Amino acid sequence: MKSLSFLNHEFEAFPSPELALNDPNGLLAIGGDLRPERLLSAYYNGIFPWFNSDDPILWWSPDPRAVFIPGEVHISTSLRKYLKKQPWRITINHAFTDVMAGCAQPREKQSGTWITQEIQMAYRELHHTGHAHSIEVWEGERLIGGLYGLAIGQVFCGESMFHRKTNASKAAVAALQQHLLKMGFKLIDAQVMNPHLESLGAKGIKRIDFITLLRELRNNPVDPATWTTKEVILELE
């Protein structure tokens, strides 16, 4: 029987994702905190936090799950041509805090953000410990787009992206895919499907299949140099 779990501030194991509610889709647990060990345990088990500033902490594992396969992200011919013309520079882990702040800005027709100060502090700590990473897109010295997420073995768990110029977030996605392919990653978790992700080639897979893939990949080693601060040259041929 599916039922909602309530977490206290003592560290405890998450319930199985299979126990998540159908309505709302994927809600698994309420409460707890955003300590690094709890966040890492969540992602390690296919669970992520998502809540508004006036909500308690909510933990989710939706079914279906939106994913990308590195190498199958759709970069259209017109987008390739557009990106080739731009004098943009793309980097890894140069400005994690600024990327999170950009992602936290309310979108058009939205009054608030789920990327609260509490969330930003928690993920900055994960960045400092080498678990959370960012891709930045620059025009000169101005940050015009980017994304951030967590690396769990050979899985990259995407959290959010933003742009201040047209297609800058898509440039970040293209750079992420290129980098992950080179570093041997097998899966990008995009969490919940939406039209934008679908246009980029995201697929919805059953939660049980996602968890199976995650268990196969989460302990696989990756090159320690994968997330050193560096510049990425987009290969768009």
Swiss-Prot record:
InterPro entries: Acyl_CoA_acyltransferase (IPR016181), Leu/Phe-tRNA_Trfase (IPR004616), Leu/Phe-tRNA_Trfase_C (IPR042203), Leu/Phe-tRNA_Trfase_N (IPR042221). It catalyses: N-terminal L-lysyl-[protein] + L-leucyl-tRNA(Leu) = N-terminal L-leucyl-L-lysyl-[protein] + tRNA(Leu) + H(+); N-terminal L-arginyl-[protein] + L-leucyl-tRNA(Leu) = N-terminal L-leucyl-L-arginyl-[protein] + tRNA(Leu) + H(+); L-phenylalanyl-tRNA(Phe) + an N-terminal L-alpha-aminoacyl-[protein] = an N-terminal L-phenylalanyl-L-alpha-aminoacyl-[protein] + tRNA(Phe). This is Leucyl/phenylalanyl-tRNA--protein transferase. It comes from Shewanella baltica (strain OS185). It is found in: Cytoplasm. HAMAP family: Leu_Phe_trans. One of its GO terms (molecular function) is leucyl-tRNA--protein transferase activity. Keywords: Acyltransferase, Cytoplasm, Transferase. Functions in the N-end rule pathway of protein degradation where it conjugates Leu, Phe and, less efficiently, Met from aminoacyl-tRNAs to the N-termini of proteins containing an N-terminal arginine or lysine. It comes from the Bacteria. Its EC number is 2.3.2.6. One of its GO terms (cellular component) is cytoplasm. The gene is aat. Pfam families: Leu_Phe_trans. Belongs to the L/F-transferase family. GO terms for biological process: protein catabolic process. It is an enzyme of class 2 (transferase). Disulfide bonds: none annotated.
